[in-house]
Amino acid sequence: MLDANKLQQAVDQAYTQFHSLNGGQNADYIPFLANVPGQLAAVAIVTCDGNIYRAGDGDYRFALESISKVCTLALALEDVGPQAVQDKIGADPTGLPFNSVIALELHGGKPLSPLVNAGAIATTSLINAENIEQRWQRILHIQQQLAGEQVALSDEVNQSEQTTNFHNRAIAWLLYSAGYLYCDAMEACDVYTRQCSTLINTVELATLGATLAAGGVNPLTHKRVLQADNVPYILAEMMMEGLYGRSGDWAYRVGLPGKSGVGGGILAVVPGVMGIAAFSPPLDEEGNSVRGQKMVASVANQLGYNVFKG
């Protein structure tokens, strides 16, 4: 049994120690994100038996951004299976920035990882759908099933993203020309941009992690969202590429599958036990929340969780 007092203590200590840490800056290339108050911070745990522990601004809703890639990967695995995902997208770190075009050129147009922009756009195109709206609604629904029904598209974030996503449009056309996109290029890019533009809070993000930790069953709704056999593939990708250029460092120091987003959210999964999430907008140069990394790592360390430890 998990000790409730110990879990709340871990969350409180992580928040107290790091919520006002200096360093980093908001993502400034997306206007909406640049204007989020930089002092916001939160950390939360959701356990596999549905208990919630939290500190800070846990109700504040922020843009899901790249963490959405985890949800779309999960849906693609459900739709086409792990072998097709590996064959058509890949399962290897690129070793380059998350929005790299060079990574595509170096590997014949294959995106390699579903957790970088090129791979995520290609993953969006793998979703079974007859048209753009069905593709979008299925992706939104999986986000809601994994994290909570309150997850919804922000028109303001989406507009901010759609007017600045020229780089991703270029990536989509490169994928299409290389034969690694499985629907219309601009449809894939549009839906990908929408999936990044949903709003979530820190408790819901921890719920997403707890659903993965529980083998695909949401511990708050008690509904099975994913086949248990698909979850290890998601966690493997998160370990390899979840924190962009910091992924290796994260695995080395923290030892948990994780995923970050430029909206300031960060998620970690303790398989069979819990999801840990944090939020704070200022980012490091790789696009990861400075305070969020510290808070999640602190909780994991205090509780002794690391998948590489016996």
What spans do the regions from the language model cover?
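A short acidic/small-residue loop/turn micro-motif
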Residues: 59-61
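Active-site-adjacent helix/loop patches that line small-molecule binding or acyl-intermediate pockets
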Residues: 2-23, 76-195
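Penicillin-binding protein/beta-lactamase superfamily catalytic region
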Residues: 133, 162-165, 173-233, 284-289
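Active-site SXXK
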Residues: 49-50, 63-86, 208, 276
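Short Gly/Pro-enriched turn/cap motifs at secondary-structure boundaries
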Residues: 33-36, 112-113, 163, 255-259
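A charged amphipathic helix-loop-strand protein-protein interaction module that recurs
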Residues: 12-15, 19, 67-78, 228-248
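Structured C-terminal helix/loop/strand segments within mature extracytoplasmic catalytic/sensor domains
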Residues: 215-310
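A short, well-structured edge-of-sheet supersecondary motif
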Residues: 19-55, 265-268
